[in-house]
């Protein structure tokens, strides 16, 4: 994370919050869910990772860092003093757009102003392996609007992302994290859930597209996933999702081990009729909680809230949002994703 005065102020803020020295006015600037999170004393009995009791992971969809946080003070965004140089004396912010017909033109980053239109609903961009590789252009970084369309140069400010900016200012934001793979959704989610896309093809890969992102897909993967490793190590885990609508964002559905668990539960190949998960299902297969209908309320987190209230939150949890709250351009929006993230934080605090 970039180090500067703003980051120093954030660290000082968190230190003051931990000692109770922060003013009520400063805390009041944050949403209630963030205020409650900041008010919880840190469990730092040993000062090591052993103090971590629960890890809850929510991965949202298809937003670049600069699309959200390019204007946030203190990060390497649009204020970067050393932008990547391009051919012809341009830099990476000056992208040449070559349309299918008509003259080419330079496209600069532009503000998606919600006061001037429905910027929350800007359409999505292509996000598959071929267009990602072409936009990257062997590292030249010069063809983003040509292959990702001109809206790939659009960005939001705090006015559109009030909750996301509050999260970034209250906690840690990393400005140099990148996709595991120049490609689409499922491949990167495979890195998230398994650490690889099987590049050598030893176990069903290499995965470069979304063809295996549902239970009844024609392709099958056979390498070991993180949940399986946790299971072997005796670490409790669970995937919280609504199986009829997880926006096909759970890549575990592509693995034979999880499909076998689905079949043992008596479900059809596609998971239907999507029976509500119960702990008794684990006697059939512990992996069913990776592809079962663990949030039958439509994905609105009631099962997560119930587990927390009962003291049964697993040591490691993944949450997969339904399409409307996935933050993916098109079916979702920044404000809908913010609401969902806030609900997760509300449940945890």
Predicted regions and their residues:
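N-terminal pro-sequences and low-complexity stem/linker regions of secreted or lumenal proteins
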Residues: 2-349
């Amino acid at each position: 994370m970039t180090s500067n005065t703003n980051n120093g102020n954030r660290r000082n803020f968190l230190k003051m919050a931990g000692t109770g020295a922060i003013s009520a006015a400063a805390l009041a600037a944050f949403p209630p869910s963030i205020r409650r999170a900041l008010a919880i004393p840190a469990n730092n009995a040993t000062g090591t990772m052993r103090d971590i009791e629960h890890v809850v992971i929510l991965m949202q969809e298809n937003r670049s860092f600069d699309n959200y946080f390019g204007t946030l003070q203190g990060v390497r965004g649009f204020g970067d003093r050393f932008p990547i140089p391009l051919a012809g004396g341009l830099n990476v912010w000056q992208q040449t757009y070559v349309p299918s017909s008509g003259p080419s033109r330079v496209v600069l980053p532009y503000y998606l102003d919600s006061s001037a239109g429905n910027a929350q609903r800007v359409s999505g961009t292509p996000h598959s392996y071929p267009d990602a590789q072409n936009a990257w252009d062997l590292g030249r970084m010069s063809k983003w609007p040509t292959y990702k369309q001109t809206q790939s140069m659009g960005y939001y400010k705090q006015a559109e992302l009030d909750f996301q900016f509050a999260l970034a200012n209250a906690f840690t934001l990393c400005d140099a994290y990148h996709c595991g793979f120049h490609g689409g959704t499922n491949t990167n989610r495979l890195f998230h859930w398994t650490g690889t896309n099987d590049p050598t093809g030893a176990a069903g890969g290499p995965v470069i597209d979304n063809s295996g992102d549902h239970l009844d897909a024609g392709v099958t993967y056979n390498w070991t996933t993180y949940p399986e490793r946790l299971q072997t190590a005796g670490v409790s885990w669970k995937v919280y999702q609504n199986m009829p609508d997880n926006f096909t964002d759970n890549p575990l559905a592509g693995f034979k081990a999880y499909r076998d668990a689905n079949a043992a539960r008596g479900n059809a190949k596609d998971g239907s009729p999507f029976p509500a998960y119960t702990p008794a299902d684990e006697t059939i297969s512990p992996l069913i909680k990776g592809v079962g209908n663990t949030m039958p309320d439509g994905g609105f987190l009631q099962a997560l809230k119930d587990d927390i209230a009962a003291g049964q939150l697993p040591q490691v949890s993944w949450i997969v949002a339904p399409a409307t709250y996935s933050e993916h351009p098109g079916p979702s929006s920044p404000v809908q994703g913010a609401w969902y993230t806030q609900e997760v934080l509300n449940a945890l605090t």
